[in-house]
Amino acid sequence: MWKFFYLFALLFAFGIAGCGKKNDRSNQISVQPVKQEEPLPQDGEERYRATYVKAAQAFSRNDLDGALAALDLSDQAKPDQASNANLRGAIFTRKRDWAQAEAAFRQALKLQPDLPMAQFNLGEVLFLNNKYSDAREKFQNFLNSQPSNDLGLYKIYLCDLLSGNNAKADSFLSSLKPSPNSPIYYFAKAAEAFHRKDKEAATEFVTSAYRIYPPDANSTFADSLVEKGYLSGEQASAPQPEDKKLKSDELKTLLPPVDKADSKPKS
């Protein structure tokens, strides 16, 4: 989905061998050596890649300040890289610094207009700030290059639903059917029920999704409902007991194959 450089990390292992007689160490205190940072490569391209990897790793650990510091070094090594700007936007999104996040994603798209994830991420920032019309445009741009992406379809549906574009929202919702490949049907139904304040029905749709699909598949759809205050984080991530999960033979009956060609919202 996201066009990446293939990044290679060079790992060096240093071994220290003891010389001389074997000593009795039973009474000695073990001291852990201080871990030292490896020097950065001198070559600009290698330094750029190495520091980008450091930034991405820090982001995955939620070390956001460390990620920004590594990105600064990456920018110094090779300025004006769309991948750097996109990652910077993701960091500021996690910090909930919306202005800097939006600026970073727009910079990424200025540098590489066809970067799909920057389109999606910018749409997400606009969506989280209730700018549904602008968000829909960015999600549509993302879908133009990822036409079968259910998360993009779902985001466009939410923009229509929450902005009061009832005709498009209703049309898309009526086109959906349960699928073994994606929980979009259940979360779109849940969003519509939450929106009309039928919490009981909405919760049942969410519960059904978690009975059928893996947690990771559900979480990407549930996140939007959490951000909009419909679900708590605990509700969106709570695993279902094994005895409540559907078996594979039940899935075949419940989830007939569907053609998703008609599921794309009208632009």
Feature annotation, model-predicted:
Residues 84, 118, 152, 185-186, ...:
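TPR alpha-solenoid repeat register
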Residues 44-83, 87-94:
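Alpha-helical segment of the N-proximal tetratricopeptide repeat
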Residues 141-164, 174-183, 194-217:
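TPR/TPR-like (Sel1-like) alpha-helical repeat modules
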Residues 86-87, 121, 155-156, 188:
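Canonical tetratricopeptide repeat
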